[in-house]
């Protein structure tokens, strides 16, 4: 079982989503930005390994305007060596990667121009994974698309659109249930006709709300769509509802209690779990540590390291948090449960101010005098929320910031 996250880590500011505006497109700019994106992909994968994360979704913008007609540059040849180096790192470290085209990539559309662009976009994603020379266990995830007033016809159009894909794309494509158009049963039906795997998304299933299957029943159905030898381990998406936002919004962090309840129901299937959550790799580390603690393989240093990482965030909500921690056993899951409850509580004004000042002390040697004066001005004016927003901007300028700062800015 691997646990991972999507696209943009929090604990490093390496990123792969640099873009080019159409009006600014040139070969030199394209080569420069693509090189930066690929260099940072390598850094992110190396960083993930250090944090025991072996599942990662690569963002679609890794190759700027990768499927746009303006881009006639043979990026596969230009970056052949770099792409193969990244692919070798992925294979040597048994990392599993995936990609997920955006909502406008729909192969069941009735519009020919949209279908053409959608197929071209899927082929771009496939070409990227192929250029890494990774096997077909590294997938491209796609939603079915729109209903367009006739669900039966929309399903048939998906089957027709699928047939227009290259053989490589067909082998990489997996389909996911969504929250409003195509339910788990719909996706399983399409899967049975195309013989391709299904990605089960728990929150989408809850939002769609058309079945009362237990998780074990769902997993028993979904796992049959995966050929382990060809497609790899069954992969699922796990997320939780943000209680303060509209239905279907992902939570700021994974509640460890909810995750472990989920895990207890599905552990016999040993799936790879992609977390869809705002704090990305931080929640991945949280879930990985918790399962290691359950399986008695957790490094003894992990408890102290995580408290150190979270200390500013804890202080923001409780100036006396240290006294409470002293009453705990050295149990990381107990700590995470305390943390999850604390993050739902109002900020402690005294603790919030103190946490900002401590964060500033960690950061002060890396920022300009002007930035320092402005931050102090916000603190003196008791504009603590604005001070944290400003602090977040400053931290994001650092490629590998101290972890306690990354954890601190991961939550508002």
From Swiss-Prot:
Under Enzyme Commission nomenclature, its number is 3.-.-.-
GO molecular function per UniProt: endonuclease activity
One biological process term from GO is: pyrimidine dimer repair
Q: Which domain of life is it from?
A: Bacteria
- Keywords assigned by UniProt? DNA damage, DNA excision, DNA repair, Endonuclease, Hydrolase, Nuclease
Briefly, what is this protein's role?
Component in a DNA repair pathway. Removal of UV LIGHT damaged nucleotides. Recognizes pyrimidine dimers and cleave a phosphodiester bond immediately 5' to the lesion.
Family as reported in the entry's similarity comment:
Belongs to the uve1/UvsE family.
PANTHER family attached here?
Answer: UV-DAMAGE ENDONUCLEASE (PTHR31290:SF5)
**Protein name per the record:** UV DNA damage endonuclease
Query: From which source organism is this entry?
Result: Clostridium perfringens (strain 13 / Type A)
């Amino acid at each position: 079982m691997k646990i991972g996250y999507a696209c943009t880590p929090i604990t490093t500011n390496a990123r792969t989503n640099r873009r080019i505006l159409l009006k600014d497109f040139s070969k030199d700019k394209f080569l420069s930005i693509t090189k930066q994106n690929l260099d940072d992909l390598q850094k992110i994968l190396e960083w993930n390994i250090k944090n025991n994360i072996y599942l990662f979704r690569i963002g679609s913008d890794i190759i700027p305007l990768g499927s746009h007609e303006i881009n006639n540059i043979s990026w596969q040849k230009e970056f052949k060596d770099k792409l193969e180096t990244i692919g070798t790192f992925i294979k040597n470290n048994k990392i599993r990667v995936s990609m997920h085209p955006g909502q406008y990539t729909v192969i069941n559309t009735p519009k020919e121009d949209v279908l053409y662009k959608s197929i071209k976009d899927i082929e771009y994603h496939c070409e990227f994974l192929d250029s890494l020379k990774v096997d077909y266990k590294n997938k491209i995830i796609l939603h079915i698309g729109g209903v367009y007033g006739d669900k039966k016809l929309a399903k048939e159009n998906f089957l027709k659109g699928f047939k227009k894909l290259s053989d490589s794309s067909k082998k990489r494509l997996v389909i996911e249930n969504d929250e409003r158009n195509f339910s788990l049963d719909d996706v399983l039906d399409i899967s049975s006709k195309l013989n391709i795997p299904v990605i089960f998304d728990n929150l989408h299933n809850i939002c769609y709300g058309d079945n009362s299957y237990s998780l074990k029943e769902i997993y028993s159905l979904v796992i049959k769509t995966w050929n382990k030898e060809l497609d790899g381990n069954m992969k699922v998406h796990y997320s939780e509802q943000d209680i303060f936002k509209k239905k279907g919004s992902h939570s700021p962090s994974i509640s460890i209690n909810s995750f472990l309840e989920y895990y207890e129901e599905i552990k016999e299937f040993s799936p790879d779990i992609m977390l869809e959550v705002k704090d990305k790799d931080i929640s991945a580390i949280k879930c990985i540590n918790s399962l290691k603690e359950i399986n008695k393989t957790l490094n003894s240093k992990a408890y102290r390291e995580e408290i150190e990482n979270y200390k500013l965030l804890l202080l923001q909500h409780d100036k006396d948090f240290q006294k409470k921690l002293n009453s705990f056993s050295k149990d990381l899951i107990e700590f995470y449960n305390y943390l999850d409850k604390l993050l739902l509580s109002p900020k402690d004004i005294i603790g919030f101010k103190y946490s900002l000042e401590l964060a500033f002390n960690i950061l002060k040697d890396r920022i300009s005098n002007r930035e320092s004066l402005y931050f102090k001005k916000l603190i003196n004016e008791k504009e603590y929320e604005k001070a944290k927003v400003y602090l977040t901007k400053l931290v994001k300028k650092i490629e590998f910031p101290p972890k306690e700062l990354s954890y601190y800015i991961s939550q508002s």
